[in-house]
Every structure is written in C-alpha cells, then in structure tokens.
C-alpha cells in the first residue's frame, strides 16, 4: 500500500471514504484513555492535521499511548467520513508503527509560543503552525513570481552573487576575500594589495543583480532575476536584513510607465495566486495574525494604484498638519512614517511615488528634463510602506558618465556597464521587489526575521 498525503485526503476526501489508507507523519498531539486514544498527525503536505483514532485492540496500544509529540509514525487504517463531527473525517487505525522517537524535552509543546522564542529555535520553527503557514506561502509566492514572468515571455537570468561593482553606489557591501587577515599583502602605498586576492581585485557580495540583468535585457528584451542579495547595513529594524531575496525585472524599450504597469500587475497576480492556492494558511493569518488582512489584500487587488510625483507627495505631507518624527521638506528621502501617512490616511490604497530628487537616488536612474529629479518610482503599500523601487535607466552615455563623476564612482569598475550604451542602446526600465517585504504584506507578519528561514541580521548569523 502506497502512502497518501494529508493534502490528498483533504482535497479528495470523498474519494477515500471507506478505503484503507497508509499515512506517515509526525505526532502533533496525542491523548489516550485506558481503552482508546486520539493522535493528530501531520506529514508536512498540508496546513491542517488528520485525526487518528486507536484502541486497545492494537497489540502495541500501551506503547502508542506513550508516544511523544514530534515522534514519527506510520498509520494504516480505514479512512472514515464523519460529517456530523467536529472534524470532517478521521482514520481508524488498524496498525501504527513508530518510525522515530522524540525526546521528552521537545521544545514545541502544545501551547502558543512567542515569535521571539521561535526565532531562537529556527531549526524547529517550521513545525509550528505559524511558520508552517509562512513558509508554505513563501513557496507559493516564489512560484507565482516565476509563473507571472514566464507567462509574459520574460527570460530568467541568474546573476552573480560575487561582484566587483556596487549597483547602488552606497558602499554598504560585504567583502569576499581569501587573504590572510592577520598579515595581508601590501602594495607600495602600504594599502592592502587586492591583486593578490582570489579574484585579483577587491570583490563583494552583490547588493543587486540589476546591472547584470540590464546586459541581458539588451539582448532578450524582457528578463528577470530572483535571488539573494546582501547589504551590510547596521539597521536593526523589523524591516531590514543583511541577506534577503530580490525580484528584479528589466525591460528594454520600456519607459517609467511600463515599469509601473508591470509592477502593479505583478503584485496583484502574486496576491491572487496565494489567496487561491493557500486558503487555509491565509485564513490562519487573517484570524490569528492580522484580522484586517483579507480586507487589505482585497483592497489592493481591486484598486487602481495611485500615482503622484515626489513633489506632490511632499506638498501633501507639508500641508497635512501632522507632526512627524522626521520633518518634511523637498529633498529628503521619505521615511516609513511619511509613506504610511500617504497610503494609510490619504490614498488608502497602494501608491506609486515618482520623480524623486536625483541626489537621493542611484547613479543609473534617468535624469529628467528639469535636471533635478530622476525617472524613478517607489511603490508604497498600506501598513508597510515601500516594497518596490525602480526607475527608467539612464541610456545616454555622456549623461551617465557625468553622473558617475559627480558621485565619485570609478568608471573603470563599470566599464562593461558603460559599454552597453555604445552598442545599440535603447530606453529601458526595471525595478526591484524585496521578496521578504512582499511576504510580510501577504501574511501580516510584522518582522522580516519571521518570513525568512534563517535570518541574517546585525550581530546574528545563527544556524
């Protein structure tokens, strides 16, 4: 007899009614009396458990009664429909075999644990209800990302994790080296001689796959990357991590408005896909984590995203009469409190803010005709703030070189990026979606550490 999955039994319960089934999984709960008992078992294929009924007709009844939570078992028995009971069906056990025991000190007992505590046992937390739901949604959302772009003929590109350039020009990068840290080689100036390093130059973990993706967009037209990125920011907040995943599409022959249209369509697609394919998990989040989650998500997919310029946003904030922790004036980088005021109180829906001052944006963003702003846009969503940032890219070689000089960037480090502008350049646009922030928005989970399997943050690289 082949094993069935818990998911199969839930989705096709009527087909299994009255049949013999075989199921392997982990004990979630167990309670037993002198002559019968109940086990809730889960095999990881579905959010909900299945109840197993066992009695003293089994030769190993006493042994079964002493099973410990998280023990691994295999159950054989009749699948019985119970439409009038609390649970819609159960398995009447004819044979229960212990596959692997669990110690009495198993940390996840049947009670509610804080998210902080569960972070300390990240190797076990996928077994909890909350994180079973989180990581199932994360998996489905990742699949939805690929599905969205593949259905639209985007080419998936794997960009390097080790790079010699800084896509953001911010310098907050993790260095990669094999040099002897106690006695590194020095050059004539007394500085570390990176020509003796593994790559023959200074190398870092990537902060973005964008620059590499642009090279492919100018060959395949529409491409996307989806992979880990790294930022050495000492930001000990609920929204920042040192290692996180980014979705970065790049589109040739595309202006800023094309990026906005694609990003809006993508966000709605991901939400709809997850809502449709993880109804039990999403119901759990709406009931246990964020009681307004469904209303917020339905509002997103049924709304036309707002679009205003940065200048208009600043004007709204200045006239609001609101006392912000960070004062508002033209030229500042909008803070989360400003973003959430715009989305939560003014527009009450997702909002694109466009045309930011060039001095607070990256070197590769296309400068507008006013020479003060760039063709950039961030997507702000209610309850969170920014989840997407992007721009039309600067395709004019002379303008790009001048901008790099203004920011004291070494053009030699970007020679290949500049060369793209010499051989068949065209307007092109792209954006980056922080995947973890999207998962936070989908689930109502408020801390980025709780939507990534093993979070890497300032001062923490456990597991």
Swiss-Prot record:
EC number, as in UniProt: 6.1.1.22
Pfam families: tRNA-synt_2, tRNA_anti-codon
Broadest EC class assigned to this enzyme: ligase
Entries under PROSITE patterns matching the protein: AA_TRNA_LIGASE_II
Superkingdom in the source lineage: Bacteria
Listed GO CC annotations: cytoplasm
Localization in the cell: Cytoplasm
Catalytic activity: tRNA(Asn) + L-asparagine + ATP = L-asparaginyl-tRNA(Asn) + AMP + diphosphate + H(+)
GO biological process: asparaginyl-tRNA aminoacylation
Chief site of localization: cytoplasm
Family: Belongs to the class-II aminoacyl-tRNA synthetase family.
Subunit details: Homodimer.
Protein name per Swiss-Prot or TrEMBL: Asparagine--tRNA ligase
Gene: asnS
């Amino acid at each position: 007899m082949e094993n069935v999955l818990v998911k199969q039994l839930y989705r096709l319960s009527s087909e299994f009614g009255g049949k013999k089934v075989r199921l392997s999984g982990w004990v979630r709960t167990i309670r037993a009396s002198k002559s019968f008992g109940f086990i809730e078992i889960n095999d990881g294929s579905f959010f909900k458990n299945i109840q197993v009924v066992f009695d003293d007709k089994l030769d190993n009844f006493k042994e079964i009664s002493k099973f410990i939570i998280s023990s691994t078992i295999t159950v054989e028995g009749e699948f019985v429909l119970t439409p009038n009971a609390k649970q819609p069906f159960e398995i009447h056990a004819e044979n229960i075999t212990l596959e692997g025991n669990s110690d009495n000190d198993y940390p996840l007992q049947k009670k509610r644990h804080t998210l902080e505590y569960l972070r300390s046992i990240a190797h076990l937390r996928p077994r909890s209800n909350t994180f079973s739901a989180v990581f199932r949604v994360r998996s489905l959302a990742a699949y939805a990302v690929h599905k969205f772009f593949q259905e639209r003929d985007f080419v998936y590109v794997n960009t390097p994790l080790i790079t010699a350039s800084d896509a953001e020009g911010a310098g907050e990068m993790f260095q990669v080296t094999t040099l002897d840290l106690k006695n590194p080689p020095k050059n004539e100036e007394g500085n570390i001689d990176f020509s003796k390093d593994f790559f023959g130059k200074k190398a870092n973990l990537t902060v973005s796959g964008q620059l590499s993706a642009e090279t492919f967009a100018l060959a395949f037209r529409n491409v996307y990357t989806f992979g880990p990125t790294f930022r050495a920011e000492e930001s000990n907040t609920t929204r920042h991590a040192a290692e996180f995943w980014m979705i970065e599409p790049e589109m040739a022959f595309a202006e800023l408005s094309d990026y906005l249209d694609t990003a809006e369509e993508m966000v709605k697609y991901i939400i709809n896909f997850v809502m449709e394919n993880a109804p039990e998990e999403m119901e759990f989040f709406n009931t246990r984590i964020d009681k307004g989650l469904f209303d917020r998500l339905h509002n997103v997919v049924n709304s036309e995203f707002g679009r205003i310029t940065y200048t208009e946003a600043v004007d709204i904030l200045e006239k609001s009469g609101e006392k912000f922790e960070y004062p508002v004036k033209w030229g500042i980088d909008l803070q989360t409190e400003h973003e959430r005021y715009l989305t939560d109180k003014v527009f009450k829906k997702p909002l694109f803010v466009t045309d930011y001052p060039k001095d607070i944006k990256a070197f590769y963003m296309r400068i507008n005709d006013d020479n003060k702003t760039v063709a950039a846009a961030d997507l702000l969503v209610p309850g969170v703030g920014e989840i997407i940032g992007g721009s039309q890219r600067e395709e004019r070689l002379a303008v790009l070189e001048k901008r790099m000089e203004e920011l004291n960037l070494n053009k030699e480090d970007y020679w290949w990026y500049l060369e793209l502008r010499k051989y068949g350049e065209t307007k092109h646009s792209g954006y980056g979606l922080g995947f973890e922030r999207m998962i936070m928005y989908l689930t109502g989970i408020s801390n980025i550490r709780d939507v990534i399997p093993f979070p890497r943050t300032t001062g923490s690289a456990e597991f």
